[in-house]
Amino acid sequence: MVILALNCGSSSVKYQLFDWEKKEVVAKGMVERVIIGDSFIMHEVPGRETYRKEYECPDHKVAIDLIIRTLVDGEHGVLKDINEISAVGHRVVHGGEMFTRSVLIDEKVLDAVKDVQHLAPLHNPPNIAGIEAAQAVLPSVPHVAIFDTAFHQTMPEHAYLYPLPYEWYEKYGVRRYGFHGTSHLFVSKRAAVLLGKKPSDCNIITMHIGNGVSHCAIRGGVSIDTSMGLTPLEGAVMGTRCGDIDPAIPAFMMQKENLSAKEIDSILNKKSGVLGVTGRFTDRRDVIENANNGDHRCKVALEIEAYRLKKYIGTYMAVLGRLDAVVFTAGVGEMGWPIREKTIEGLEGIGIKLDRERNKSAMTRKRETLITTDDSPIKVFVIPTDEELVFTEDVVAILDGTYTDHMNFDYSFARQDFVRS
């Protein structure tokens, strides 16, 4: 069984082809600059040089068609025929309250995803476009939706409701939903393995730190709180998003700068966070380099980010009552050792003892690493995430009828004998 996993953004399509019988990734890549022009595909096959080709993709259908043609290409492909693809798994950012698990996509499901796209206007429309495009290119295979929000549907009411007029929740669904669910699921299961415990016996804080950043408090394998909210704007400091701020600031600045609601929303989502403070950078490597060279705004940006991360550890530790481990994952979480160090240092009093040398050596996207001392009561791990593997396993389980939900399903990566492909 060969599964194609697709992750469609507003101007990109990421893909991964997984051979389930061999338990290995046979190809992966990305089409970038979809719609906006000068688009190209980067195609990777293990053991070969990365293949790049410029090809104009005015929409997602053309991009997905390009991916399929590349996968079956005589020189660069890995398939002899398009019919070797057994099913397609699609990342869908927002599933509202309706979807608590991954589901087979039919007309009713697609309509429901469209009904909640107002809750994620930057994310769901390209997800929907990708589903429709893939169905057009691969009409005879099953398509499955895997929702970012599903993992967090276990949050209690007191965690997901905002102290706002209750009618807003009833009429418009205004509540905390949370995102990056598949990433939090994967790394929390792996952390339980590294702890030598069952997920049901673990209390874990997972920290997904990339351009987007979210944290999750996980008790007994279940999400009980998360930092992102109604939208991915809430929570920690991010590459271009502000995260938690005084909610009066937008109205204040709209008056001062004569900004529209659309303009202030764009600023908070695209011109704030690390970019807003530094004025130049979203890539933390650039921020770290310039901070080390004396750039005050870059130094402050790092301090703000690490300070907010530290606060979330304390907050979620209080919520959980007992903590077994903290996990760093995603691009910055996996590679940004200075940010991890700034976040963890000073937490010895609550049982987290950083091993600085281990932390500095944990700079790989392949290895799971303990970065606290052996005698640290609370462990801190760096665990590379693998959302596409979650997509793949959900698809396979739905097709063979063994899938229940993310809490009870026996994922391969939750086993002691799991080996990364």
From Swiss-Prot:
InterPro entries given in the database record: Ac/propionate_kinase, Aliphatic_acid_kin_short-chain, Aliphatic_acid_kinase_CS, ATPase_NBD
Annotated residues for binding of ATP: 14, 208-212, 283-285
Enzyme Commission number(s): 2.7.2.1
Keywords recorded for this protein, A-Z: ATP-binding, Cytoplasm, Kinase, Magnesium, Metal-binding, Nucleotide-binding, Transferase
Record Pfam families: Acetate_kinase
Chain sites annotated for binding substrate: 91
Active site: 148 (proton donor/acceptor)
Pathway listed: Metabolic intermediate biosynthesis; acetyl-CoA biosynthesis; acetyl-CoA from acetate: step 1/2
GO terms for biological process, alphabetical: acetate metabolic process; acetyl-CoA biosynthetic process
GO MF term (any one): acetate kinase activity
Necessary cofactors: Mg(2+); Mn(2+)
Gene3D superfamilies, A to Z: 3.30.420.40
Top EC class of this enzyme: transferase
SUPFAM superfamilies on file: Actin-like ATPase domain
Superkingdom: Bacteria
Cofactor note: Mg(2+). Can also accept Mn(2+).
Catalytic reactions on record: acetate + ATP = acetyl phosphate + ADP
GO cellular component, one term: cytoplasm
Residues the record lists as binding Mg(2+): 7, 387
Known function: Catalyzes the formation of acetyl phosphate from acetate and ATP. Can also catalyze the reverse reaction.
Similarity comment: Belongs to the acetokinase family.
PANTHER family attached to this UniProt entry: ACETATE KINASE (PTHR21060), ACETATE KINASE-RELATED (PTHR21060:SF15)
Complexes and interactors: Homodimer.
HAMAP family: Acetate_kinase (MF_00020)
Protein name as catalogued: Acetate kinase
Gene (name only): ackA
